[in-house]
Swiss-Prot record:
HAMAP family recorded: MatK (MF_01390)
GO MF entry, a single one: RNA binding
PANTHER family referenced in this protein's UniProt entry, alphabetically: MATURASE K
A GO term from the CC aspect: chloroplast
Annotated function: Usually encoded in the trnK tRNA gene intron. Probably assists in splicing its own and other chloroplast group II introns.
Stored InterPro entries: Domain_X (IPR024937), Maturase_MatK (IPR002866), Maturase_MatK_N (IPR024942)
Name the record gives this protein: Maturase K
Domain of life of the organism encoding this protein: Eukaryota
Keyword match Chloroplast: yes
Protein family according to the UniProt entry: Belongs to the intron maturase 2 family. MatK subfamily.
Principal location class: plastid
Pfam families: Intron_maturas2, MatK_N
Example of a GO biological process term: RNA splicing
C-alpha cells in the first residue's frame, strides 16, 4: 500500500463534510415530498428556488409527519431494550405512516447526501469554465462516438455491472467520502430497521430485500449504486494513471439532466495498460498488458468494452473486472457471465438498439497503362437496428399485445376520456419514433407503431362497446393516423432542423437527436 500513496490522497480529497442536523429540519422533508410527487427538473440543474408547494393538504401531511418524528420516543433506539428500538411501526393500523416514514426519510437523506457532490461538481465546471448547458449531453451522443470508434475494433464484450448482494457493501463505499460520523451510523441503522420492517410485515427474504429497497427508495438506492459504480471506474482510472508513460487520450463525463447521479460515463483509452489486482490488495505483484486500442462505454448498469486487440487480451481484461469485484468489493461474480464476441459476427444490445458491424465490399477497376485489375475494398459500417423482439416483449408485459405481437385492448385505460386514451398512445408512438430515429432500417419501428395504433383502436372500441371496424368507420381512420404521424421539431445532429419520419415514410437516414435525456420506458423494461 506504500507504493500507491496517490490512491489514499485521492480518497481523502474526495471526503466531504455533511450537516447531520439537517435531517431534523422540516424543509428537507417537504423538499423530499415534492420530489416524491414527481416534479420535473433537478435540484441542482434547475432554478435554485423550490417551487410547487401548492398542495396544502400535502404540506399538512408532511407537517404531521415531522411532528410525529419529534414527539415519538422510539425514533432512536433505546439502550438495552430491543423491543422498543423500532424505526417505524409495522402494525397494520400504522401501515400508511410506516411507509411514509421510510419514504420521506430515505428521500431526505438522499437529498442531503447529494449536496456536497453537486457542489464539488459545480466547482469543477467553474474551474474549467464549462457552461452548464454544454454538459446536458444526449444519450444519442454515444452512438456517433461508437460509429466512429468501434468500426476498427475486433472484439466486443458485454458487461452487466452486478448489484451487491448486501446493502452494507454500498454503505462501506461511502466511508471514504464522508467525514460526518453520525451520517455513517445513521444510514446502516436505517437500512437495518427498514429491512426488519419489510421482513416482518411482508415476509420478504433477505435475498429480496435489496430489490424491495431499490423499488421503494429509488433516489437513495440510485445514489448508493452509482457511488459503487463510480468507485469501480475510479479504480480503473487510478490504475491507469500509475502507468504515466502511457497517455490517456480521452476521458469524458456526461451527466444526465434530471438526476446528476444517473450519469453516463464514456471512457476512451488509447495504449491502455491493463493491471490485474491481486488478492492481497495491491501488496503483491502487479502484471500488465499493453492494449493498442480500447473503448469503454457505460450507461447505468450496463457497459460495453470494445478492443482492436486479440482475444487473449480481452480475456485478461475480463478477469481484471472479475478480480476487482471479488477481491475489492467482496462479492462473488462468475467470469462466464462476461461474454467476449467477435464484433464482425455479433450483435450486442445497448441503449435500446441492436448494434453490429456490417462489412461492405466494393469492387473498383483500376487501369494502369495497358493493364487493368480489380481492387476489392472492404469498409466497416456501424449498424443500429430497432430490436423488434425486445420491444414486442415489453409491449406484451404492458398488455398492449400478445407474446406473438397481436394487438389487444388496454382494459385499465378504458375508463379514461377518448382524448386521454389517444394522447397516451400517441405519446408512446412519438417517444418511440424520437428515440429510435437513429435506426438504419425503420420497418421494425413501423410494426411497433402499428401495434400501438391498433391497440388504441381496440381500447376505444372496447370502451364504446363496439368493434374496431365499426368504430373506425364511424369516426374515420384518418383520426388516429393523423395524430400518430404528428411529430415535433427537435434539434438533431443533422442541421437544419428535421422532422422525423412519418408513419408511412420510407426514410433511411439515421438521425441522432440532442435532447434524449433518458432511456425510453419500453427500452428499460425490455
Amino acid at each position: 500500500m506504500e507504493e500507491f500513496p496517490g490512491y489514499l490522497e485521492x480518497d481523502r480529497s474526495r471526503q466531504q463534510p455533511f450537516x447531520y442536523p439537517l435531517l431534523f429540519q422540516e424543509y428537507i422533508y417537504a423538499l423530499a415530498h415534492n420530489h416524491n410527487r414527481g416534479l420535473k427538473g433537478s435540484l441542482f440543474y434547475g432554478p435554485s428556488e423550490v417551487x410547487g408547494y401548492d398542495s396544502k393538504s400535502s404540506l399538512a401531511l408532511v407537517k404531521r409527519l415531522i411532528i410525529r418524528i419529534y414527539q415519538q420516543n422510539d425514533f432512536l433506539p433505546v439502550v438495552n431494550d430491543s423491543n422498543k428500538x423500532r424505526f417505524v411501526s409495522h402494525h397494520r393500523g400504522n401501515f400508511f405512516y410506516s411507509h411514509f416514514y421510510s419514504x420521506m426519510i430515505s428521500e431526505g437523506y438522499a437529498i442531503l447526501v447529494e449536496i456536497p457532490f453537486s457542489l464539488r461538481l459545480v466547482s469543477y465546471f467553474e474551474k474549467k469554465e464549462i457552461p452548464k448547458s454544454h454538459n446536458l449531453r444526449s444519450i444519442h451522443s454515444i452512438f456517433p462516438f461508437x460509429x466512429x470508434x468501434x468500426x476498427x475494433x475486433n472484439y466486443v464484450s458485454d458487461i452487466l455491472i452486478p448489484h451487491p448482494i448486501h446493502m452494507e457493501i454500498l454503505v462501506q463505499i461511502l466511508q471514504c467520502r464522508i467525514q460526518d460520523v453520525p451520517f455513517l451510523h445513521f444510514l446502516p441503522f436505517f437500512l437495518h430497521k427498514y429491512h426488519n420492517w419489510n421482513w416482518n410485515s411482508f415476509l420478504i427474504t433477505p435475498k429480496k430485500s435489496i430489490y424491495v429497497f431499490s423499488k421503494e427508495n429509488k433516489r437513495l438506492f440510485r445514489f448508493l449504486y452509482n457511488s459503487y459504480v463510480s468507485e469501480c471506474e475510479f479504480l480503473l482510472v487510478f490504475l491507469r494513471k500509475q502507468s504515466s508513460y502511457l497517455r490517456l487520450t480521452s476521458f469524458g463525463l456526461f451527466l444526465e439532466r434530471r438526476h446528476f447521479y444517473v450519469k453516463i460515463k464514456r471512457l476512451q483509452m488509447q495504449h491502455l495498460i491493463l493491471i490485474v489486482v491481486c488478492r492481497d490488495y495491491f501488496q503483491g505483484t502487479l502484471w500488465s498488458f499493453k492494449d493498442p486500442f480500447m473503448h469503454y462505454v457505460r450507461c447505468q448498469g450496463k457497459a460495453v468494452l470494445a478492443s482492436k486487440g486479440t482475444h487473449l487480451l480481452m480475456k485478461k481484461w475480463k478477469y481484471n473486472f472479475v478480480n476487482l469485484w471479488q477481491y475489492y468489493f467482496n462479492f462473488w461474480y462468475q467470469s462466464y457471465r462476461i461474454h467476449i464476441n467477435q464484433l464482425s459476427n455479433y450483435s450486442f444490445y445497448f441503449l435500446g438498439y441492436l448494434s453490429s458491424l456490417l462489412k461492405n465490399s466494393s469492387m473498383v477497376r483500376n487501369q494502369m497503362l495497358e493493364n487493368s485489375f480489380l481492387v476489392d475494398t472492404v469498409t466497416n459500417k456501424f449498424e443500429t437496428l430497432v430490436p423488434v423482439i425486445f420491444l414486442i416483449g415489453s409491449l406484451s408485459k404492458a398488455q398492449f399485445c400478445t407474446v406473438l405481437g397481436h394487438p389487444i385492448s388496454k382494459p385499465i385505460w378504458a375508463d379514461l376520456p377518448d382524448s386521454e386514451i389517444i394522447e397516451r398512445f400517441g405519446r408512446m408512438c412519438r417517444n418511440l419514433s424520437h428515440y429510435h430515429s437513429g435506426s438504419s432500417k425503420k420497418q421494425g419501428l413501423y410494426r411497433i407503431k402499428y401495434i400501438l395504433r391498433l391497440s388504441c383502436a381496440r381500447t376505444l372500441a372496447r370502451k364504446h362497446k363496439s368493434t374496431v371496424r365499426v368504430f373506425l368507420r364511424r369516426l374515420g381512420s384518418g383520426l388516429l393516423e393523423e395524430f400518430f404521424t404528428e411529430e415535433e421539431q427537435v434539434l438533431s445532429l443533422i442541421l437544419p432542423k428535421t422532422i422525423p419520419f412519418t408513419f408511412y415514410g420510407s426514410h433511411k437516414e439515421r438521425i441522432w437527436y440532442l435532447d434524449i435525456i433518458r432511456i425510453n420506458d419500453l427500452v428499460n423494461h425490455s
